[in-house]
């Protein structure tokens, strides 16, 4: 510590040893200044002169201000107490570009440790300055678009001036693909237009025979393309109903629709979906079952219509149900093509509520109004006498009879015709009885209380006996139909529950068999089947 304190004291002082300039004589100082002055004056370089701004020459005399200065008066207008900035700005010299750049605020340098900064903002700013528009084209104005993006981002490069190797490769691949597609199309058309391979194909298209003309070639292409799309448009099977012996079934086929004919479905917020059964449906089906082969043909999908059919016809009075899968799709409509039924169309009657469903066979159709849920409707019951007459009288072709009722209400018109025929029949019967002499044996037997046998072995009345009693032929047919209907109703009342139980057991048995077959197929697939 003592050494550090003594060390500054031992150092020599500069102020004491340095000679004092003021002590030198004046003559020596003048000689020094005279000797150090250069003989030629020093001139500044031109670069330094140009960099320094020229200072305006100072006025030789100071400006004389007026004794009275209006801007400092307190009583004058405040607006007049302002300096004339415009005059000062005009009188002051313009600032140089270097000075404006120095006065501009300096932006911070980018931090390159965070990556190279984006130049998008600078490019957009330069583009906007070049185009003369300082705002973005938010409204997508076409004029602004052409003005701002007329160069397509290429700048001074012309449109076809540069093409990369990748673009050339893509262009070659595109040309190759187009060529292959064209060759494939031509080859495919030529293959589709070839002659028929088998006799079955040629018989299936009788209007398009084999040949090498352009028209036949085009027709075969069209026919084969139609075969491809027919899988989705035509019915699922070429024969919707199986082949049966005509002696074991009714000779006539009655095809019925479901929606708005037998049932009516509606939706409401309070009850949701509800399905109502039309009045007289049970009587209609059970009565006509003895004359017709009943077929349900609906455009509703099977998953929806099958549940309704189970409730509508629990005793399987309807023999064959057909759903949307059996219809034909054409021009946006589901058509019921009766030619797929595998039945003679002269003995087929279709009852529907839409004319579009019977577009292909309108001569076989009876179009009724849609049932809207009226509980007092009697349309189906009123149609029974006409249908019973067609089947009971054995009409050869139902289409001719239906054509005679075209444009008229069938129940009303048939009632008028039946009344006219009954009046004529009664008149002819009365005239015949007057001409026919009464036999003596008949009068004697009636007097003794004996009646002649005018019935068959099964208890049915002979037609001739019925005619003598004044009954028309279809009156006798109607009586037999009523008796058969009563027998059917009696069987349903006595054995209906038994039939339902048997059908439920049969369905359960089929379901169990299907489950067993599915389990066996799964275990066999994974190698767990039974070893023989």
Curated annotation (Swiss-Prot):
Top-rank taxon, per record: Eukaryota
GO molecular function terms noted in the UniProt entry: identical protein binding; mitochondrion targeting sequence binding; protein transmembrane transporter activity
Key words of the record: Membrane, Mitochondrion, Mitochondrion inner membrane, Protein transport, Transit peptide, Translocation, Transmembrane, Transmembrane helix, Transport
Biased composition (Low complexity): 61-106
Biased composition (Basic and acidic residues): 141-157
Mitochondrial matrix side: 33-175
Gene3D superfamilies: HAD superfamily/HAD-like
Pfam families per record: NIF
Transmembrane segments: 176-193
Family assignment from sequence similarity: Belongs to the TIM50 family.
Self-association and partners: Component of the TIM23 complex, at least composed of TIM23/timX, TIM17/timQ, tim50 and TIM21/timU. Interacts with preproteins in transit.
Protein name: Mitochondrial import inner membrane translocase subunit tim50
Organism, scientific name: Emericella nidulans (strain FGSC A4 / ATCC 38163 / CBS 112.46 / NRRL 194 / M139) (Aspergillus nidulans)
């Amino acid at each position: 510590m003592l050494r550090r304190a003594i060390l500054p004291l031992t150092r020599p002082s500069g102020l004491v040893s340095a000679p004092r300039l003021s002590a030198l004589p004046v003559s020596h100082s003048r000689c020094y200044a005279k000797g150090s002055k250069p003989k030629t004056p020093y001139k500044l370089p031109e670069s330094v002169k140009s960099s320094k701004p020229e200072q305006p020459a100072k006025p030789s005399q100071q400006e004389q201000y007026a004794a009275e200065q209006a801007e400092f008066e307190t009583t004058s207008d405040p607006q007049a107490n302002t300096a004339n900035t415009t005059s000062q700005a005009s009188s002051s010299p313009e600032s140089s570009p270097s000075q404006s750049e120095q006065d501009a605020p300096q932006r911070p340098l980018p931090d390159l440790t965070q990556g190279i900064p984006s130049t998008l903002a600078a490019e957009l700013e330069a583009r906007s300055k070049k185009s003369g528009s300082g705002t973005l084209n938010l409204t997508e104005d076409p004029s602004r678009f052409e003005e701002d993006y007329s160069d397509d981002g290429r700048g001074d490069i012309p449109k076809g001036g540069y093409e990369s190797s990748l673009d050339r490769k893509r262009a070659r691949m595109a040309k190759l693909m187009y060529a292959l597609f064209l060759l494939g199309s031509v080859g495919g058309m030529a293959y589709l237009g070839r002659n028929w391979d088998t006799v079955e194909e040629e018989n299936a298209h009788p209007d398009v025979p084999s040949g090498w003309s352009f028209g036949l070639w085009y027709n075969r292409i069209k026919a084969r393309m139609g075969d491809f799309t027919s899988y989705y448009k035509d019915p699922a099977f070429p024969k919707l109903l199986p082949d049966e012996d005509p002696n074991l079934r009714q000779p006539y086929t009655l095809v019925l629709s479901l929606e708005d004919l037998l049932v009516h479905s509606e939706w409401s917020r309070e009850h949701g979906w509800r399905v109502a059964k039309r009045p007289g449906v049970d009587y209609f089906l059970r009565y006509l079952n003895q004359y017709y082969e009943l077929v349900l043909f609906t455009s509703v999908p099977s998953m929806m219509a099958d549940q309704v059919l189970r409730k509508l016809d629990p005793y399987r009075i309807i023999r064959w149900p057909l759903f949307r899968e059996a219809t034909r799709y054409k021009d946006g409509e589901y058509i019921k093509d009766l030619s797929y039924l595998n039945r003679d169309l002269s003995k087929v009657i279709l009852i529907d509520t839409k004319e579009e469903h019977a577009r292909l066979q309108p001569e076989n159709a009876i179009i009724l109004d849609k049932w809207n849920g009226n509980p007092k409707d009697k349309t189906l019951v009123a149609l029974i006498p006409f249908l019973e007459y067609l089947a009971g009288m054995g009409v050869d072709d139902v289409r001719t009879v239906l054509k005679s009722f075209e444009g008229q209400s069938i129940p009303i018109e048939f009632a008028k015709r039946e009344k006219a025929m009954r009046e004529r029949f009664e008149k002819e019967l009365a005239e015949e009885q007057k001409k026919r002499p009464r036999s003596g044996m008949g009068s004697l037997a009636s007097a003794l209380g004996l009646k002649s046998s005018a019935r068959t072995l099964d208890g049915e009345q002979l037609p001739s006996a019925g005619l003598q009693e004044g009954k028309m032929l279809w009156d006798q047919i109607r009586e037999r139909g009523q008796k058969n209907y009563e027998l059917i109703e009696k069987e349903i009342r006595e054995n209906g529950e038994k039939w339902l139980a048997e059908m439920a057991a049969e369905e359960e048995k089929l379901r169990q068999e299907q489950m067993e077959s599915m389990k066996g197929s799964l275990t066999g697939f994974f190698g767990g089947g039974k070893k023989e």
